[in-house]
From Swiss-Prot:
Disulfide bonds: 6-28, 13-34, 18-35
GO CC field: extracellular region
Keywords: Antibiotic, Antimicrobial, Disulfide bond
Protein name: Antimicrobial peptide CHP1
Pfam family, one: Defensin_beta
Amino acid sequence: GRKSDCFRKSGFCAFLKCPSLTLISGKCSRFYLCCKRIR
């Protein structure tokens, strides 16, 4: 699913919004966004 795609891109899933210093890189599920840390 999309969740494993997120982890493969070294991202993580966050509820509704991504924490600061991260970028939205997709969706994990209906309410969870895939977030990626800014390096």
